[in-house]
Amino acid sequence: MTIVEVVVLSASSGMLRYRTVSDALPAGVHPDDLALHLSGLTLCTPGATLHSTSWRFASESVVLTYAALPDPSPSATVPLSPDRMVTGHAALAPSPPSVDTDAVAAHAARHLALLAVTDPVIAAAASTRPDLWDLLTKLPTGVAGALR
């Protein structure tokens, strides 16, 4: 089974916050379409951004993770822990034994921080939402793993 998970980002009191939503991918549906539906974003949302950031194997399913912003319903959010990262234990065993939601959200946010300075489409969207992107672009732009 494939699960589509969306980390929906918002800002409050100068802090990045997030919530996650997910659902099983129905047959014949593109993951991007389900992620857009789950995010609640529309083509009319100023600065709307949806980007695939990672995948992992969990509970007999492949989980495709997307980052989305701005959150159209920023209730029940939690603070983003941008330094929360997990890594595999060996070069030939890249998957960490477990990946918690905070690590997934941190990875997604750092991925967007990198795209803000490398992808002109994302940079254009970012220019319309400085309240969120100013916070995102302060994050380290490493997207996978970290040297400790």
Show the residue positions of the predicted features:
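Nudix hydrolase/Nudix homology domain
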Residues: 16-23, 27, 56-67, 73-148
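Conserved Nudix-box catalytic region and its N-terminal flanking loop in Nudix hydrolases
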Residues: 1-44, 51, 57, 85-95
